[in-house]
């Protein structure tokens, strides 16, 4: 599945929430640009872009379940949602694992070996 198809799937997942859609487009554009300027290899660039697209996948659930989108809730709820979302996206298992990890830690500060590819 191409990045554009992942984007289309995530926009559909967002069910017309223009705030969420605009945010994911902005974050994706920043991530894409930074990755290209850093001259990432193709696989790392793909992981970066898909993680950027999916990073707030848990926001709709968090709003419903907790009444807010607190970062810790997003991380907790986002990992299984991202894992399910990625099942039919045609990425390798290690790409999926990296993306799920990034979604589950995108509000966590600190150094991590897993942020290095």
Language model segments and positions:
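Generic alpha-helical secondary structure signal
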Residues: 1-8, 22, 42, 76, ...
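Divalent metal-dependent catalytic cores for phosphoryl transfer on phosphate-bearing substrates
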Residues: 46-117
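Short, mixed-charge, low-aromatic patches
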Residues: 3-9, 33-40, 55-61, 116
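Alpha-helical phosphate/pyrophosphate-handling elements in metalloenzyme active cores
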Residues: 15-48, 83-89
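Active-site flanking loop/helix segments enriched in acidic
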Residues: 2-26, 58-69
């Amino acid at each position: 599945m191409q990045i554009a198809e992942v984007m289309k799937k995530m926009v559909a997942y967002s069910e017309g929430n223009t705030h969420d859609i605009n945010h994911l487009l902005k974050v994706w554009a920043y991530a894409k640009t930074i990755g290209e300027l850093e001259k990432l290899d193709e696989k790392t660039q793909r992981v970066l872009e898909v993680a950027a697209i999916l990073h707030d996948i848990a926001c709709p659930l968090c709003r419903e379940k907790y009444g807010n989108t607190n970062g810790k809730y997003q991380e907790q709820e986002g990992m299984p949602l991202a894992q399910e979302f990625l099942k039919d996206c045609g990425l390798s298992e290690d790409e999926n694992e990296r993306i799920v990890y990034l979604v589950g830690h995108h509000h966590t500060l600190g150094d991590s070996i897993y942020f290095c590819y």
